[in-house]
C-alpha cells in the first residue's frame, strides 16, 4: 500500500499494522520529519518516497532502487507511478485534498484519515469508496452495517484540553496548554482542533458526506470510551464502545479482514463513569456553525481555510486561542453565500479565505 503522511500519528500506527500483518509498503511521504522517514525507509524499504519540502530532499536516505519525489506536484506524480491499489491518506490539513482526488481519479481505494478532504471536497469524492480512519466514523460504519435507515447519528467529543477550564481563563491559555489532550495522543493541529471543537464540526461534516444524512449530532463524553451512537426509527439506540486507540479504525480501513485482537477490550466496569453532556456553544462557538454547514456544505471550504490559518498562527504564538474561533466565525459570515461548482473553485476559494483570515488576524476584526 501507499502511506501519505507516514511520520505522523496515523502514519506511524498504520506502519505498525502493516508490520504486524505482513503488508508491503510501496510508497511513503512526509512533510519535514526526515529523521523518522529515514528510519521508515530502512525498515519498510519502499520503492517510492516523497517529501513536501524540496530543501530537505537531499537528506533522504533512499535505497538504490528507490525513487524520490518532491513537493505537492511530486506527490501526485508518485501516486501515478505506484501500482498499489490502497492509499492511506494521513496528511494533515487542506494539503491532503489533492491526493485524495488523485487517488480516486486513478481508481485506487482510499483509506482516509485526512478530514479536510471531505470537509472541503466531499461533493467531488466518491464516498462509497472511502474507508474512514476515524474512531467516530468507524464506529458509525460498524453500527450501520445491515441495519435499517437511522433516525439520527451521534458522535462524541472529549471536550479537549480545556473541557474543565473555566471560560474566563481561556483568553490566556498557551499552545502547550492546548496540546495536553486528556485521552488521545494526536498531532498538534488536530489536538488544537479538539480544544476548539472544530474537530467535531469537521467530523459532523464528514458524517454528512459519508452517510448521506443531515440528522447528525455530537455530545461530549469525557472518557472517550463511547465513540458513536445510532438511533433507529423504532426507538432503539446502539453504541460503539472501545478504548481510545486509533489502531482499531486503521486496521479495519487497511486490512481485508480483521479477525484477531487489535486493541485491549474496554473495561466494562469503567462504563459507570460515562456521562453525556451538551456542547456549550459559548465555550465552543465554532460548533455553532453545525446547522449552517449542514444546510450549505460548500461552507466547509471556508471554515477549514480560516481554521487552518488560525490554528497555525496560534501554534506560532501569533494570536490567542480565542482568536481561532473568532476568525472562523468571521470568515463564515463573510463567505456565507459561497457556492462551489468545480474542483478548481475549491482551491480558489481556499486561497481567498486564507488571505481574508490573515488580514483579519492582523486587524483584529
Swiss-Prot record:
Q: What is its EC number?
A: 1.1.1.267
- Top-level taxon in the UniProt lineage: Bacteria
What InterPro entries does the record point to? DXP_reductoisomerase, DXP_reductoisomerase_C, DXP_reductoisomerase_N, DXPR_C, DXPR_C_sf, NAD(P)-bd_dom_sf
Q: Which reaction does it catalyse?
A: 2-C-methyl-D-erythritol 4-phosphate + NADP(+) = 1-deoxy-D-xylulose 5-phosphate + NADPH + H(+)
Residues involved in NADPH binding = 7-10, 31-33, 114, 116, 187
Q: Which UniProt keywords apply?
A: Isoprene biosynthesis, Manganese, Metal-binding, NADP, Oxidoreductase
Gene3D superfamilies the UniProt entry points to: 1.10.1740.10, NAD(P)-binding Rossmann-like Domain
Query: Pathway listed for it?
Result: Isoprenoid biosynthesis; isopentenyl diphosphate biosynthesis via DXP pathway; isopentenyl diphosphate from 1-deoxy-D-xylulose 5-phosphate: step 1/6
For the ligand (1-deoxy-D-xylulose 5-phosphate), the binding residues are 115, 135-136, 158, 181, 194, 199-200, 203
SUPFAM superfamilies in alphabetical order? 1-deoxy-D-xylulose-5-phosphate reductoisomerase, C-terminal domain, Glyceraldehyde-3-phosphate dehydrogenase-like, C-terminal domain, NAD(P)-binding Rossmann-fold domains
Protein name, UniProt field: 1-deoxy-D-xylulose 5-phosphate reductoisomerase
Native species: Campylobacter curvus (strain 525.92)
Amino acid at each position: 500500500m501507499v502511506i501519505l503522511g507516514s511520520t505522523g500519528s496515523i502514519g506511524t500506527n498504520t506502519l505498525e499494522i502493516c508490520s504486524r500483518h505482513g503488508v508491503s509498503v510501496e510508497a511513503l511521504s512526509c512533510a519535514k520529519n526526515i529523521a523518522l522517514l529515514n528510519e521508515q525507509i530502512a525498515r519498510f524499504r519502499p520503492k517510492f518516497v516523497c517529501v513536501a519540502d524540496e530543501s530537505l530532499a537531499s537528506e533522504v536516505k533512499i535505497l538504490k532502487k528507490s525513487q524520490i519525489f518532491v513537493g505537492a506536484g511530486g506527490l501526485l506524480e508518485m501516486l501515478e507511478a505506484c501500482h498499489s491499489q490502497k492509499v492511506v491518506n494521513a496528511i494533515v490539513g487542506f494539503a491532503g485534498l489533492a491526493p485524495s482526488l488523485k487517488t480516486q481519479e486513478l481508481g485506487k481505494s482510499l483509506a482516509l484519515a485526512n478530514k479536510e478532504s471531505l470537509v472541503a471536497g466531499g461533493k467531488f469524492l466518491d464516498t462509497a469508496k472511502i474507508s474512514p480512519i476515524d474512531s467516530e466514523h468507524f464506529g458509525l460504519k460498524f453500527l450501520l452495517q445491515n441495519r435499517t435507515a437511522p433516525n439520527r447519528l451521534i458522535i462524541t467529543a472529549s471536550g479537549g484540553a480545556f473541557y474543565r477550564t473555566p471560560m474566563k481563563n481561556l483568553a490566556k491559555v498557551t499552545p502547550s496548554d492546548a496540546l495536553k489532550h486528556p485521552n488521545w495522543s494526536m498531532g498538534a493541529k488536530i489536538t488544537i482542533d479538539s480544544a476548539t471543537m472544530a474537530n467535531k464540526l469537521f467530523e459532523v461534516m464528514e458524517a454528512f458526506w459519508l452517510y448521506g444524512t443531515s440528522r447528525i449530532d455530537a455530545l461530549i463524553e469525557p472518557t472517550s470510551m463511547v465513540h458513536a451512537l445510532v438511533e433507529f426509527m423504532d426507538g432503539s439506540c446502539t453504541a460503539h464502545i472501545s478504548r481510545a486507540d486509533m489502531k482499531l479504525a486503521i486496521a479495519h480501513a487497511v486490512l481485508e479482514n480483521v479477525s484477531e485482537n487489535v486493541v485491549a477490550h474496554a473495561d466494562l466496569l469503567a462504563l459507570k463513569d460515562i456521562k453525556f453532556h451538551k456542547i456549550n456553544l459559548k465555550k465552543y462557538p465554532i460548533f455553532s456553525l453545525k446547522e449552517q454547514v449542514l444546510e450549505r456544505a460548500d461552507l466547509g471550504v471556508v471554515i477549514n481555510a480560516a481554521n487552518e490559518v488560525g490554528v497555525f498562527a496560534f501554534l506560532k504564538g501569533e494570536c490567542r486561542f480565542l482568536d481561532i474561533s473568532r476568525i472562523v466565525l468571521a470568515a463564515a459570515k463573510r463567505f456565507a453565500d459561497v457556492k462551489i461548482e468545480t474542483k478548481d473553485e475549491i482551491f480558489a476559494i481556499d486561497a481567498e479565505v486564507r488571505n481574508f483570515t490573515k488580514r483579519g488576524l492582523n486587524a483584529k476584526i
